[in-house]
Amino acid sequence: MKDYYAVLGVEADASDGALKSAYRRRASEFHPDRNPSPDAAQKFRETQEAYDLLSDPAKRHDHDENRRRSLLENPLATAQDIWKTYMNKLVQ
């Protein structure tokens, strides 16, 4: 399960304004017209996907419930995903 909050670089309790600001910053950073990196297009799509989900209150609520349930049902896999996301952020 993707951590869309990590994709945008915000906390789970981020306001709508913080989400929008993070989305604009990341979209600008990874837009294929502005970033020649081979993985920029993929990161741009992930950023769009994360914002589309988190900007819709119903989808965001469902996502938060799935995150909570995932942590309770499979803590090792969730911890590994969190650690992987953290390490990827460090090397960027």
Walk through the language-model features, giving the residues of each:
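C-terminal accessory/regulatory regions appended to core domains
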Residues: M1-Q92
